[in-house]
From Swiss-Prot:
Belongs to the NifH/BchL/ChlL family. The gene is bchL. Homodimer. Protochlorophyllide reductase is composed of three subunits; BchL, BchN and BchB. The lineage of its organism: Bacteria, Pseudomonadati, Pseudomonadota, Alphaproteobacteria, Hyphomicrobiales. This is Light-independent protochlorophyllide reductase iron-sulfur ATP-binding protein. Component of the dark-operative protochlorophyllide reductase (DPOR) that uses Mg-ATP and reduced ferredoxin to reduce ring D of protochlorophyllide (Pchlide) to form chlorophyllide a (Chlide). This reaction is light-independent. The L component serves as a unique electron donor to the NB-component of the complex, and binds Mg-ATP. Its cofactor is [4Fe-4S] cluster. It is an enzyme of class 1 (oxidoreductase). It comes from Rhodopseudomonas palustris (strain BisA53). Pathway: Porphyrin-containing compound metabolism; bacteriochlorophyll biosynthesis (light-independent). GO terms for biological process: light-independent bacteriochlorophyll biosynthetic process; photosynthesis, dark reaction. GO terms for molecular function: 4 iron, 4 sulfur cluster binding; ATP binding; metal ion binding; oxidoreductase activity, acting on iron-sulfur proteins as donors; oxidoreductase activity, acting on the CH-CH group of donors, iron-sulfur protein as acceptor.
Length: 310
């Protein structure tokens, strides 16, 4: 992995070889360039972004289960130093890639797949990339090492769906690295200003990465919200569709406290509706019924004006 500020210095980019040149993500950007050979392969890859605490891990885990119930082989990758993305699937905090690499003094050849990939509920395979110590290192490096390990152990060859659950609303080059592997980036947001403001920044990050990679905006997942009027305003202005809606139900909040996905809880009418929504979303994403969109992020002032702030 290379961190570059000058896009003309990318490997393979010369004045006489312009077809290999890659434009920068934006003026003054510091880019994390992953090894171009580290491609995930034939699996459909989705990255889940959104404001910190908005419910990305809950959304990711239940979406993973929904895909698995469609008969798909699913791998969920948590990209957060807290390494708690998959614990409702595995019922525990599993060791991170960084943890296990450190245990063998970063001699990756000494690792076995079972050292860092764990089976969760309904056969969903779970991995926590982890992250560098606070204030040091780069999350993009961790993502790169994780994909490298998976490829070296041929763990992506039998995978249909990969879901990256990504730290907060950070859109730096490091934590935007999963976008370089993704087909679609989904944005989780609530019906409030802070969540939508973060969503707008994420749209900008996805659009920047889309210049050089195959990732596209997949849509907005409304979460923890009974109403969606503010989200729908934002959706109309940016061209990013709302593709699912999960209301603010106490049963969803409690599912995480119970270390369970929503598909494991006792039946109730309101729970059944949420399960059906996850199954509908997974089906549409798998079948490509939600076409990619060319979302256009708003300027900060436009967000304030749009949502009624003076």
């Amino acid at each position: 992995m290379n961190i570059l500020t000058d896009p003309t210095k990318l490997q393979g980019c010369t004045d006489t070889n312009a077809n290999k040149c890659v434009e920068g993500d934006g003026e003054g950007s510091v880019q994390v360039q992953l090894d171009p050979d580290l491609k995930i392969g034939t699996a459909k890859v989705f990255s889940i972004y959104g404001k910190g605490g908005i419910g990305k891990s809950t959304t990711s885990s239940n979406l993973s289960v929904a895909f698995s119930k469609l008969g798909k082989r699913v791998l969920q990758i948590g990209c957060d130093p807290k390494h708690d993305s998959t614990f409702t699937l595995t019922k525990c905090l599993i060791p991170t890639v960084i943890d296990v690499l450190e245990s063998v003094n970063f001699h990756a050849e000494e690792l076995r797949p079972e050292d860092f990939v764990f089976e969760g509920y309904n056969g969903v395979m779970c991995l926590e990339a982890g992250g560098p110590p606070a204030g040091t290192g780069c999350g993009g490096y961790v993502v790169g090492q994780t994909v490298k390990l998976l490829k070296e152990h041929h763990l992506l060859e039998d995978t249909d769906v990969v879901i990256f659950d990504v730290l907060g609303d950070v859109v730096c080059g490091g934590f935007a690295a999963p976008l370089q592997h993704s087909d679609r980036a989904m944005i989780v947001t609530a019906n409030d200003f802070d969540s939508i403001f973060a969503a707008n920044r994420i749209v900008a990050a996805i659009t920047a990465k889309a210049k050089n990679y195959g990732v596209r905006v997949g849509g907005i997942i409304a979460n923890r919200s009974d109403a969606t009027d503010q989200i729908d305003k934002f959706s109309e202005r940016t061209g990013v569709p709302r593709v699912a809606h999960f209301p603010a139900l106490d049963i969803i909040r409690k599912s995480r406290l119970k270390k369970s996905t929503l598909f494991e809880l006792d039946h109730s009418p309101e729970l059944a509706k949420v399960q059906e929504e996850y199954m509908r979303l997974a089906t549409e994403l798998w079948e490509g019924k939600q076409p990619p969109c060319e979302g256009k992020a708003l300027k900060d002032r436009e967000i304030f004006d749009l949502l009624g702030f003076d």
